[in-house]
UniProtKB/Swiss-Prot annotation:
A GO CC term assigned to this protein in UniProt: cytoplasm
Lineage: superkingdom: Bacteria
Quaternary context: UreD, UreF and UreG form a complex that acts as a GTP-hydrolysis-dependent molecular chaperone, activating the urease apoprotein by helping to assemble the nickel containing metallocenter of UreC. The UreE protein probably delivers the nickel.
Keyword Cytoplasm recorded: yes
Protein name: Urease accessory protein UreF
Entry-linked Pfam families: UreF
Gene3D superfamilies attached to this UniProt entry: Urease accessory protein UreF (1.10.4190.10)
Biological function: Required for maturation of urease via the functional incorporation of the urease nickel metallocenter.
HAMAP family: UreF (MF_01385)
Main location: cytoplasm
This protein's UniProt keywords: Chaperone, Cytoplasm, Nickel insertion
Organism (species): Cupriavidus taiwanensis (strain DSM 17343 / BCRC 17206 / CCUG 44338 / CIP 107171 / LMG 19424 / R1) (Ralstonia taiwanensis (strain LMG 19424))
Keyword flag Metal-binding: no
Protein family: Belongs to the UreF family.
Amino acid sequence: MTGLHQLISLLHLASPALPIGGFSYSQGLEAAIECGSVHDAPTAERWIGDNLRHVQAQCEAPLWLLLHRHWQAGDAVRVRSWNDWFHATRETSELRLETEQMGWSLARLIAQMEWGTPALRETLAALSPVCLPTAFTAACVALEIGARDGLAAYCFNWAENQVAAAIKAVPLGQVAGQHMLRRLHGAVLDTVDEACRRAEATPPQLSTFSPMLGLLCARHETQYSRLFRS
C-alpha cells in the first residue's frame, strides 16, 4: 500500500464521521465544567492538554502501541491480556461503558468492512468486551497504518472530541474551538513521544494514577443535568 493510500485510510479511520459514537462522551470534562474547574476557553484547553500529557501519555497511549505491536505479530494471547488489563483500569461504570460501546462498534465495523485477515477478525470477535484501543489498533494493522501515525491520529481524534464537548458544554464558539485544537497539536505530539518511550521500556512503564479524573467521572454518574454519557 502506498503512502497516500495509507494516509487516506488513516483519515477514514480517524474521521468524526466514523459511526462509533465518540461524540456522546466527555470523559469527565462535563463534570469538570459542572464543578467550575473548567469555565472558559483557557481552562478547557488546559484541561484537555493536561489530560493528554499526564493521563493519555502515561497509560492509554503506550498501551495502544503495545496492542499495535501484538496485532502485527499475530499474538492473540497478548492482545487479549492487554485488552483485559485496560478494561480493568477503567475506574467508573461510565468509562467502562464508553470503551466497551466504542470498541464493540468499531469491531463490528471492521467485520462488516472486511478489513484485515480472517484471523485478525476472528481474534477481535472473540474478545468480550473489546476495548476501543484494541479495536482501533486492529483496524490500523488491517489497513497497514504504522504505529506512530496511527497513535497520532488516535490522540488527535480524542482531542477533537474533547474540544467538541467543550464547545457544547462550556459553551464556546466554533472559532475559539478551532484555535484551541490548533494549540493542542503540541500536546498530541508530546503524548506520542512519551508513549513511545514508555512502551519501549522493559517492562512497559504504564501508570493509571489520575485521582481527580476518577473522582469527576464518578461524580458525573449522578450529575443532575448531563449532555454526555461520561
